[in-house]
Design a protein with these regions (language model features):
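Hydrophobic transmembrane alpha-helices and their immediate junctions
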Residues: 211, 215-226, 247, 251, ...
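Membrane helix-loop boundary segments at the extracytoplasmic
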Residues: 22-38, 93-94, 236-239, 358-402
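Transmembrane alpha-helices of multi-pass inner-membrane enzymes
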Residues: 51-57, 209, 247, 251, ...
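N-terminal hydrophobic segments of proteins, predominantly signal-anchor/transmembrane helices
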Residues: 14-32, 50-95, 104-106, 128-130, ...
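Transmembrane alpha-helical segments and their membrane-water interfaces
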Residues: 53-60, 85-139, 342-351
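Interfacial loop-to-transmembrane-helix boundary motif in multi-pass membrane proteins
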Residues: 10-18, 68-77, 108-160, 359-363
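TM-adjacent membrane-interface loops and short helices in multi-pass inner/ER membrane proteins
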Residues: 292-329, 333-340
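Alpha-helical transmembrane segments of multi-pass inner-membrane proteins
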Residues: 118-140, 164-236, 245-255
Length: 425
C-alpha cells in the first residue's frame, strides 16, 4: 500500500506542476492587477521553478539509458551554444529556454502514472469554465486579470499597440472585424487561463490530438463531453488556425497511427514543401497578417535567410521573422540542432505502443503546421502539454503494442503500474 500511496501523491504533485506550467500567467496577471506590479524577473523565476520541479520530480524514475540519451541531447545543445557564443559573443536566454522545455517535460511526463485522458479532460473543463466566464463577463475578466497591464509590465508590450482602449483584454482578443464563429456578436476571443487567445488555440489542437489517440479507451460519456468541450473552445477562442489544424489532424489520424514512427522526421520537410506549393498555386507574393500571408513569410524566409542565419549566428533574424515559427526555429537554434532534433525525435524517442506512435506522429504534424504561421508552440504554456504526454508514453514498459487491447498474462504485472497511461479510463 505504501508505494501506491507514494505514487498517488507524486501524480497529484505532477498534475499540479503541469497545471501551473500552462496557467501560471493567469496567476501572475491576477497578482499584477490586484496586488502589485509583476516584473519580467518574476516570470523568469516562475519558469525556472517549473523546470527545476520537472527535473527534481521526474529524473528519479527514468531508466539509465534514457537519462544518458537526454544528457547527450543537452550536451549537444550546450556545445552548439558555446560555439555560437565564441563566434558572436552573445547569448539569448529565450533561445536557451526554448531548448530546455522538451527535456524538462519529457522527464516530468515519464514520472506520471495516472490516466492521461482523465487528466486532460479535467484540464479541458477548467479551461472551458474560465473561458465561459470570460465570454459572459469580459469586463470583469479584464479587470480581475488585466492582460493588457500584465503584458506591458512583463513583456515590454507597447500599451499604444492595444487598439481597443476600452478593454483590458489581450490585444488580439478584441481584434477589429467580425468573428469567424458567431459573427455579428460582440464577444471577444477567449483566452481562458492562458491570458491570450493564441495559446488557447494551441490547447485546442493538443486536446484534439489527445482525443484522436485515446478515444477507443474513453467511455461514451467522457468522449461526448470531450467533443462538446472541444467544439465550445473552438467557438469561444474563434480560432481559425486551431480549427483548421484540428481538421488536418482528424483527416490524418489513420495515417498517423500507421506511419512508422521512425519516418516522423519526414513530416516537417513535407509540410514545408506543401507550404511552398500552396504559395505558388495561390500566387501570394507579399506578407499579410493572415494565415496564408504568414505561410508566404515562412517560404520567403527560408529562401532568403543568410548562411549565418541558418547556422544560428545571426540572432536578429529570429525576431525579424517572428511570425514564421520555422524560420525562428532555425535562426534561434541553428540548422544543426533542428536536424539533430528531427532525427533524435524519430529514432531516439521510441514509443512502445501504437497509441504512442500515433501521438508522436500527430505531434510532429501539428508542430510543423503550427510553425508555418507562429512560434507560439515554443512557449511553455503550449509545449509543456505535448512533451509531457510524449514523456509519459515514452516511459511505458515494452508490452502490448495495441494499448487498447488486454495484455497477455505474462505481461500484465509489468504493465499494471502504467496501464492508465495507455489510455485506460
Amino acid at each position: 500500500v505504501q508505494p501506491q500511496v507514494g505514487h498517488g501523491l507524486r501524480d497529484v504533485l505532477i498534475e499540479l506542476l503541469l497545471l501551473f506550467a500552462v496557467g501560471y500567467n493567469i496567476l501572475l496577471a491576477f497578482i499584477n492587477a490586484q496586488l502589485f506590479p509583476v516584473s519580467p524577473a518574476m516570470t523568469y523565476a516562475a519558469e525556472l521553478l517549473i523546470y527545476a520541479g520537472c527535473f527534481g520530480i521526474g529524473i528519479w524514475t527514468l531508466e539509465r539509458h534514457k537519462i544518458a540519451a537526454l544528457l547527450a541531447g543537452i550536451a549537444l545543445i550546450v556545445g552548439v551554444l558555446l560555439f555560437r557564443y565564441l563566434i558572436e559573443w552573445r547569448v539569448d536566454a529565450k533561445f536557451i529556454r526554448d531548448a530546455i522545455i522538451p527535456f524538462a517535460f519529457l522527464v516530468l511526463g515519464s514520472a506520471y502514472g495516472g490516466s492521461l485522458p482523465r487528466l486532460f479532460l479535467r484540464m479541458a473543463i477548467i479551461v472551458s469554465l474560465v473561458a465561459a466566464v470570460e465570454l459572459t463577463v469580459p469586463n470583469v475578466y479584464g479587470d480581475v486579470v488585466n492582460p493588457k497591464s500584465y503584458y506591458v509590465n512583463t513583456r515590454g508590450s507597447d500599451e499604444g499597440g492595444f487598439w481597443n482602449e476600452d478593454s483590458n483584454l489581450f490585444v488580439s482578443a478584441t481584434r477589429p472585424g467580425e468573428r469567424n464563429f458567431l459573427a455579428g456578436s460582440s464577444l471577444p476571443r477567449a483566452s481562458s487561463i492562458f491570458v491570450e487567445p493564441v495559446t488557447a488555440g494551441n490547447f485546442i489542437v493538443f486536446f484534439c490530438a489527445l482525443l484522436l489517440v485515446f478515444w477507443r479507451s474513453m467511455g461514451p460519456k467522457r468522449l461526448a463531453l470531450s467533443v462538446v468541450l472541444l467544439l465550445f473552445l473552438i467557438v469561444a477562442t474563434d480560432g481559425r488556425l486551431a480549427a483548421g489544424t484540428s481538421v488536418l489532424l482528424v483527416l490524418g489520424a489513420p495515417f498517423m497511427r500507421k506511419l512508422d514512427q521512425r519516418l516522423s522526421f519526414l513530416i516537417m520537410p513535407l509540410v514545408i514543401l506543401g507550404a511552398a506549393m500552396l504559395v505558388w498555386v495561390t500566387g501570394v507574393s507579399e506578407y499579410e497578417d493572415t494565415t496564408l500571408g504568414r505561410v508566404w513569410l515562412t517560404v520567403h524566409a527560408l529562401r532568403n535567410m543568410s548562411a549565418e542565419a541558418w547556422l544560428g549566428l545571426d540572432f536578429d533574424v529570429a525576431y525579424t521573422y517572428f511570425d514564421s515559427g520555422i524560420a525562428y526555429f532555425i535562426a534561434s537554434q541553428s540548422i544543426m540542432i533542428v536536424g539533430a532534433f528531427l532525427l533524435a525525435f524519430a529514432f531516439g524517442l521510441e514509443m512502445p505502443t501504437e497509441d504512442g506512435q500515433a501521438f508522436k506522429n500527430a505531434f510532429m504534424l501539428a508542430f510543423a503546421a503550427g510553425l508555418l504561421v507562429s512560434n507560439s508552440l515554443f512557449s511553455v504554456k503550449s509545449a509543456a502539454l505535448w512533451w509531457f504526454v510524449l514523456g509519459a508514453m515514452w516511459q511505458l514498459p515494452i508490452g502490448t503494442w495495441f494499448s487498447h487491447l488486454p495484455a497477455p498474462e505474462n505481461e500484465q504485472k509489468q504493465l499494471a503500474d502504467h496501464a492508465p497511461l495507455a489510455g485506460a479510463s
